[in-house]
From Swiss-Prot:
One of 3 paralogous diadenylate cyclases (DAC) in this bacteria, catalyzing the condensation of 2 ATP molecules into cyclic di-AMP (c-di-AMP). Upon expression in E.coli leads to c-di-AMP synthesis. Probably the main producer of c-di-AMP for the cell; is probably implicated in control of peptidoglycan synthesis. In B.subtilis c-di-AMP is a second messenger that mediates growth, DNA repair and cell wall homeostasis; it is toxic when present in excess. This is Cyclic di-AMP synthase CdaA. Probably a homodimer. Interacts with CdaR. May interact with GlmM. Its main location: membrane. GO terms for molecular function: adenylate cyclase activity; ATP binding; diadenylate cyclase activity. It catalyses: 2 ATP = 3',3'-c-di-AMP + 2 diphosphate.
């Protein structure tokens, strides 16, 4: 008995066929999402719709033009979409095309985390003082206005260059907002807490101070010791390792997508205050 002679198996095969096609289309969309290919894809959809409308309305000349555009369009797609097609083929070769991939937001967050971690580690080894504040739910517009607006994409190179001693922007804090560097050389309020160790300087007091009035997270690199600290909710956590900092940033950036029961803070260091 042939496969086609069994109605249930035929329907099941059709369903699997449709699901596979839709899955491949979905993965292709995820590959080109956020690139210029999206706009070109919209143009192709418009051409196809015009072609269908011209056929329905009997507009033979317009239909012929659309047929030519579609015919030559396939060659144009290969040329124009070359970077996206190459990336898709590379992912297919590495076996990642059919694996679960993060959303564009998650991918942007991961790149930001890696850039911050790399920059902080570089500056800590060389004892380059740094003060980096990440905005969360509480707006920090008033503090951003005290600095120099950048609205720049986050990169480890840019962060390092900002905090290089004797450069125009090194004095003050960098404030990040929505995975971007909103401003540099910003002024933060100093904490008056008596529980902060007297051995700590202005950067640490500013970090604790901003964490007392907002829900932001602030990373500090000491220029005296190269130690890395984080201030949050009025508490200062010191002597964080590179791994601990990265884990903490991942927990913070992904808190909205994680279960409440697993959304806790893990620290590898000693708490001051």
């Amino acid at each position: 008995m042939a496969f086609e002679d069994i109605p249930f198996l035929q329907y099941l095969g059709n369903a699997v066929d449709i699901l596979l096609v839709w899955y491949v289309i979905y993965k292709l969309i995820m590959v080109i999402r956020g690139t210029k290919a999206v706009q070109l894809l919209k143009g192709i959809v418009v051409i196809v719709l015009v072609r269908m409308a011209s056929q329905y309305l009997g507009l033979s000349t317009l239909q012929w033009l659309m047929d030519q555009a579609i015919t030559w369009g396939f060659l144009a797609i290969i040329i124009i979409f070359q970077p996206e097609l190459r990336r898709a083929l590379e992912q297919l070769g590495r076996g990642r095309f059919f694996s679960r991939s993060g959303t564009p937001v998650e991918e942007a967050q991961q790149k930001t985390i890696e850039a911050i971690t790399k920059a902080i580690n570089y500056m800590a080894k060389r004892r380059i003082g740094a003060l980096l504040t990440i905005e969360r739910d509480t707006g920090m517009g008033d503090y951003i206005e005290t600095g120099i607006p950048l609205n720049a994409k986050v990169s480890s190179e840019l962060l390092i260059n900002i905090f290089i001693p004797n450069t125009p922007l090194h004095d003050g804090a960098v404030i990040m907002k929505n995975n971007e560097i909103a401003a540099a050389a910003c002024y933060l309020p100093l904490s008056e807490s008596p529980f902060i160790s007297k051995e700590l300087g202005t950067r640490h007091r500013a970090a604790v101070g901003i964490s007392e009035v907002t829900d932001s997270l602030t990373i500090i690199v000491s220029e005296e010791t190269g130690g890395v600290s984080v201030a949050k909710n009025g508490d200062l956590h010191r002597e964080l390792t590179e791994e601990a900092l990265k884990e903490m940033l991942e927990a913070e950036f992904k808190k909205n997508t994680r279960d409440t029961s697993s959304n806790r803070w893990y620290w590898r260091g000693k708490k001051n205050g």
